[in-house]
Regions:
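Non-catalytic alpha/beta scaffold blocks inside enzyme catalytic domains
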Residues: 1-94
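Long, low-complexity segments enriched in small/aliphatic residues
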Residues: 88-159
Length: 159
């Protein structure tokens, strides 16, 4: 237990940085910044009772009854219309309920996160910013090998 944890009233059982997807930002030369998403290096021990932050946050929002009903709509539509339509599905839900954007990281974790490879569900929270980058810097994505005009090209960055 860390020194900080010894003083805490509550300790949440979270995975370590090696047991989950971890992000790093690099500032090589102003104004260029680089971002790297690392896959988990090891799995949590079989006898550990840990959760990643996305799961902890989602459970807290659910216990507070704050998760919008549109999450079910997003999951149904995603299953029916496919991942390539995720941007449109998410935007449709957000236009019906402003809480979608308020709780976007949790909703992305509970929807898109379930479709990501094992250990990357937390990366779903990056979807909105990845789409923003794809819109603002399409040439950078092309140089990275992500070609095409898909509306969800930014989402492919995290897949």
């Amino acid at each position: 237990m860390t020194e900080t944890a010894k003083h805490a009233d509550y300790i949440l059982p979270t995975t370590t940085q090696y047991e989950k997807a971890e992000a790093t930002f690099f500032n090589f030369e102003f104004p260029d910044n680089y971002f790297h998403l690392r896959h988990p290096v090891v799995n949590p021990a079989d006898d550990s009772d840990v959760l990643d932050e996305g799961e902890i946050h989602a459970r807290l929002v659910e216990q507070l009854n704050e998760l919008p009903d549109e999450v079910g709509y997003i999951n149904r539509e995603l299953k029916e219309r496919g991942l390539e339509n995720f941007s449109q599905i998410f935007d449709e839900a957000a236009s019906k309920n402003p809480k979608i954007n308020l709780y976007a990281p949790v909703i992305l974790y509970r929807t898109l996160g379930q479709l990501l490879p094992n250990g990357l569900a937390n990366a779903a929270a990056l979807w909105k910013i990845a789409n923003k980058v794809a819109t603002r810097s399409p040439e950078s994505l092309r140089r990275a090998g992500l070609n095409g005009e898909s509306k969800n090209r930014g989402g492919r960055v995290i897949l």
